[in-house]
Amino acid sequence: MISPNRQGIVVWLTSLKYARQLRRFGHVQYVSKKMKYVVFYCDQSKVPELVDKLSSFHFVTDVKPSMRPFINTEYEGAKPDKAKEYDYKLGI
C-alpha cells in the first residue's frame, strides 16, 4: 500500500534501455514495453523538482505527475436507484 505522502509519476521514454536509470529517482512500479513508459513513485515534496529534472534528459519525451492525491474519493449524496435497490434485496 502506498503511503499518503507518495505520488506517482509517468515518464515516456524514447527507448526502454534507459528505464533502469529511473530507479535512482524513486520506486519503479511498472514498465510498459509496448508504449515505452515507466510508472514510479516518489515523495510528494520532490515531485516538482523531479518533473523538471526528468524533462531535461535526452531520452525522455514526456513527464506527467499523477493527480490521484488531489482527487476527492469520498462522495456525498450518492444514492442507488430505487429499482436497483429493490433487485439487490431480492437477490436477483
UniProtKB/Swiss-Prot annotation:
One Pfam family it belongs to: DUF2129
TM helices/strands, residue ranges: none
Record InterPro entries: DUF2129
Alphabetically ordered keywords of this record: Cytoplasm
Gene Ontology cellular-component annotations: cytoplasm
UniProt KW Ubl conjugation keyword: no
Subcellular location(s) per record: Cytoplasm
Keyword Transferase: no
Family the UniProt entry places it in: Belongs to the UPF0298 family.
Protein name: UPF0298 protein ABC2380
Lineage of source species: Bacteria, Bacillati, Bacillota, Bacilli, Bacillales
